Amino acid sequence: MRLLVSCVDSGSIKEVLCNIGTDTSVQSALQPFHVAPHLAEGLKAYVDRMWVISEDEAILARNSGVVELVKISKHLKENEALQVDPKGESKNEKSLSDDLPKFDISEFEITSSVSDLFDDAKLESLSSKSVKRTKLVDGFVTLCPIKKDSSNNTFVAATKSGLLHIIKKGEDKKLIKLASLGLKAPVEFLQLYDLEDTDTDKYIFAYGGEENLIKLVEIDSSFQSLKQIWEAKNVKNDRLDMRVPVWPMALRFLEPSPGKTEKGKLNYQFAAITRWSHLTKYSTQHGRKPFAQIDLLPNREPLSQMEVFDAKGENVVSSLGNFQSETFNELNVITTDYKKNVFKFDGNGRMLGKVGRDDITGSSTYIHVHDGKYLLQGGLDRYVRIFDIKTNKMLVKVYVGSRINFIVMLDDVEIEMPLSPSAKAAKGKQKRKVTELEEDADELWNKLEGKVAASKASKKSKI
């Protein structure tokens, strides 16, 4: 497996190469083959978001307000020319290469960047109104391609201050800022819609945040203007007739509602997680209020993230994380609180379990379902973990020495382990045994076929 991990403390991305079964917290367990930092720029410039464009290119967004285009090149890891075995005899290069696993490692080079993408002044006036105890600081909430396109040349970079930047990778491999548009701040998330081939002249996305109701926005292909096409309404007051606070934290679209639809009304469906531990379900055909609001946790513990998954381990999400289904009945969500819990719920709010409940010791700052099979998790305890989405079994645990902000799995290919001399001898012996059995079987069949042919010939001669 090959991972890229955003490390907050050093501002670097670390490349991690490991196999299933790796656990750095157990000395006798399998250890990672390679862990190396790249592009370190310090605590004030850690990587907020990453998007892998291709095998040899990625785009990074740092919390210093910079978006960078990065070239990735791979080369075979060089083994040391000489080692000494326990008996004191030196090993030559050939025997050493036979004893060590072979794999490629990556080198990263920044080829282009755009800067000054933040507006902290816009958040200063909102800090006094926020229930957060810390000052609001700008950061990236989204970095992704604006449409399903194999070329992936145009990207959306959205910030907490409500700035929406359109950035293009030119033919000369340089980043160009095409436009910057404004949204209502503060913004906790911005989610693009990618579940159907919409009109190429417009793109749809949803956003929201603290006291910022969910809004659907349409942007034209020229990227010069945007138009709000729908806004949610708050639910009715609670049983004490108190206003319910608004704070959507994350959102995922579903496919359009099937069957009969009312003309003149938008047809979008989506589910959202709120800060106050609600799962809300919306259909624009139904109205502006959620048609269902489910309490996930009894004491309204704050929740922060949202991923959707299939209980059978199948890939049910689009490239941007939206749920490829028309019905909420099949919806399953993973979310995290600010303690140490990673929860799994079905679409009706029934808890399906906790992931890593006996192992995770700090708040999870990042979760992601990869390819429907793996849950990537990292947080304050400085461990990268990979879980099996069906069984919740921990497959990988690697210490990276820093708080974790983002994880990308580049591939899940296992690195082939070289065999020891005794294992090689046993494997060769087994192979020879199989070959001998196959030869004996062939010889036996040949004898039987010869006898059958001779029997037929004798019968013909008698006739």
Curated annotation (Swiss-Prot):
InterPro entries according to UniProt: WD40_repeat_dom_sf, WDR74/Nsa1
Keyword Ribosomal protein found: no
Keyword hit for rRNA processing: yes
CDD domains documented for this protein: Nsa1
Subcellular location: Nucleus, Nucleolus
Principal location listed in the UniProt entry: nucleus
GO BP annotations listed: ribosomal large subunit biogenesis; rRNA processing
Listed GO CC annotations: nucleolus; nucleus; preribosome, large subunit precursor
Keywords: Nucleus, Ribosome biogenesis, rRNA processing
Note: Present with 2740 molecules/cell in log phase SD medium.
Task of the protein: Involved in the biogenesis of the 60S ribosomal subunit.
Protein family according to the UniProt entry: Belongs to the NSA1 family.
Subunit structure: Component of the pre-66S ribosomal particle. Interacts with NOP7, RRP1 and RRP5.
Name of the protein described by the UniProt record: Ribosome biogenesis protein NSA1
Origin species: Saccharomyces cerevisiae (strain ATCC 204508 / S288c) (Baker's yeast)
Gene name for this UniProt entry: NSA1
